[in-house]
């Protein structure tokens, strides 16, 4: 069986990456708001990826 990645997993990873970059930029410039937005994006990405992981496991179970 092939190991396929669904769109929620990919989008979640992309949000995590975007959040990491935004958080680092905020930290480097001393902009706490940007840093906090980056942290929020990372959390949202983790949640979306976890949702994609669950969808994938359910799909494989059936």
Swiss-Prot record:
InterPro entries: CsbD, UPF0337_stress_rsp, YjbJ_sf
SUPFAM superfamilies named among the record's database cross-references: Hypothetical protein YjbJ
UniProt feature coiled coil, ranges: none
Region (Disordered) residue spans: 1-42
Entry similarity comment: Belongs to the UPF0337 (CsbD) family.
Stated name of the protein: UPF0337 protein mll8179
